[in-house]
Amino acid sequence: MLGNLALALGPWSVRLADCGPVSSAFWRLTLALPLLALCARRAGQPLGGFTLRGWLLVAAAGVLFALDLASWHLGIERTRLGNATLFGNSGSVILMVWGLIALHRRPRKGEWAALAFALGGAAILLGRSVEIGTRTLTGDLFCILAGFLYTFYILLLQNARVRTGSWPLLFHATLAGAPVLLGIALLRGEPVMPHVWWPLLVLALGSQVIGQGLVVYALRHFSTLFIGLALLSQPAVAVLVGWFVFHEALVPIDFLGMVLVGAGLVLARGSSGSEAAEPA
């Protein structure tokens, strides 16, 4: 729950940063590296000891995580915070579908319900974004892409996690992802150096160290259904921040879309805790 709450405040920090959206993602990773190394040391988890396959998996995961963050931060800049958080967490449904494909079986009732709720809610939210403007719709699509990329990032981390602890995994994935984000920011012509550092420090500490660290830790200690229920705290906090800080008022149809997507995510998490999650 604490990890999800920390992650929920990430979009607020992205909006407040005075550098570009991809640049803020670069600083999120770069500033977090010393803290991640310290956490690994205090946990007694050495940063080395990976096999060649392990190094390759973690490096690939880091690249996917960088692309996920770039896409998500671009989406946060364009769409409403509630939409950005829900669509950015759409990996639960994508992971469930991946598991069904890997198992070569048809969805069960709960899985059909997860798909129906998620797709129905997404259609409502995307329709509302079309009404608001093209920029908002583009932001939604960036966040959905981020959900796809985050799914495969988690799949690679789960494969690499077998012989090592959570902190070394997160450290090396972060180390691999930072240069990718810097390259994208420079190609986009974004300002990289900020004038005000505190939003980036909050982003690095809250999202990358506390948020990501606790979520990766929770993968080992809690059921996917529990994680899915805790996940709902993210969009709830993001909606409140968007409403009170950025004046992103919602109408009843927005709440309906968000509830449907949230229900789909929880049902998908519950499904991935059984057969659907086994191939990962």
Indicate where each model-derived feature is located.
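Specific transmembrane alpha-helical segments of multi-pass solute transporters/efflux pumps
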Residues: A6-L7, P11, A43-G82, G88, ...
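Specific alpha-helical transmembrane segments that line the substrate/conduction pathway
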Residues: S23-P34, H73-R106, A146, T224-W243
